[in-house]
Swiss-Prot record:
This is Phosphatidylglycerol--prolipoprotein diacylglyceryl transferase. Its EC number is 2.5.1.145. It comes from the Bacteria. The chain crosses the membrane at residues 19-39, 59-79, 90-110, 120-140, 181-201, 212-232, 245-265. GO terms for cellular component: plasma membrane. Its main location: membrane. It comes from Nostoc sp. (strain PCC 7120 / SAG 25.82 / UTEX 2576).
Length: 283
């Protein structure tokens, strides 16, 4: 007898293994995996564009330093009523509770500072990193599965997700199965990744040659579009009064992405795209 698909969507728990005082959590492992794969991919894309891959290695350190604390701060700010009562939990990032929009904001600011200090074009770096960002998001979303968090409304669809009673919202405690919104977003992110990689290699072959900044703008608009819909299904959205913060930010991301694309293709002078190669830097 075939097992129901819901059985496959039952989290084994947030902890992968405990070795003495050391606890390895799925969430941390997935974030580390996403970073490693993202750095490797961005270096590969840099080589294809004849850009020094070491530049992307250096940038990745800045992105992690900028993105992860910003993601946590963003989350804590919009859950301040809870963390004000338990301030010791503010730094407990291993328990979950980071916001991707905070990571995007923090990472972008870090990349801008990096580009300024290194005197390299920000937009070409952004294009090289965009596919890695969305792939990392697709991987990292599975941390929500293991933590039994960021799920959607109750559902009886075949791919429903079982949520333990202690993780259910108080007003939905009688329901067992919920929309696996982590899965929806992970699949959407993989689709955006496929689009960006296709555009990258077609541009590399000149079919057509994209303007610098295009990939990042496409990333911003398409990711935000998917998040706008998926956020509407969730039961634990960060709120500001009656507004779902992620939907407001997603609408802003769609507008900025589309406006950015229009700006890139209307302006007559293209953005600079000269980044030193390994040969130029002697590395």
């Amino acid at each position: 007898m075939a097992l129901p698909l819901a059985f496959l969507f039952t989290s084994p728990g947030p902890v992968l293994v405990e070795i003495g005082p050391i606890t390895i959590r799925w969430y941390g492992l997935l974030i580390a995996t996403a970073v490693l794969i993202g750095v490797s991919l961005s270096q590969y894309l840099a080589k294809r564009r004849q850009v020094n891959p070491d530049l992307l290695s250096d940038l990745s350190i800045w992105l992690v330093i900028g993105a992860i604390p910003a993601a946590r701060i963003y989350y804590v700010l919009f859950q301040w009523s809870e963390y004000a009562q338990h301030p010791e939990r503010i730094i407990a990032i291993w328990q979950g509770g980071i916001a991707i929009h905070g990571a995007i904001i923090g990472g972008t600011l870090a990349a801008l500072i990096f580009a300024k200090l290194k005197r390299v074009p920000f937009w070409q770096l952004a294009d090289l990193v965009a596919p890695s960002l969305i792939l990392g998001q697709a991987i990292g979303r599975w941390g929500n599965f293991f933590n039994s968090e960021a799920f959607g409304r109750p559902t009886n669809l075949p791919w429903k997700l079982y949520i333990p009673i202690e993780r259910r919202p108080p007003d939905l405690v009688s329901f067992e199965y919920f929309h696996p919104t982590f899965l929806y977003e992970s699949i959407w992110d993989l689709m955006v990744f496929a689009l960006l990689i296709t555009l990258f290699f077609r541009s590399l072959a000149g079919k057509p040659r994209l303007k610098v900044g295009t990939l990042f703008m496409v990333y911003l608009a398409t990711y935000s579009l998917g998040r706008l819909w998926i956020e509407g299904l969730r039961t634990d959205s960060l709120m500001l009064g009656p507004l779902r913060i992620a939907q407001v930010v997603s609408l802003t991301g769609i507008a900025l992405g589309l406006a950015g694309l229009a700006w890139l293709y209307v302006r007559k002078r293209p953005l600079p795209d000269v980044v030193p190669s390994a040969k130029d830097t002697g590395e």
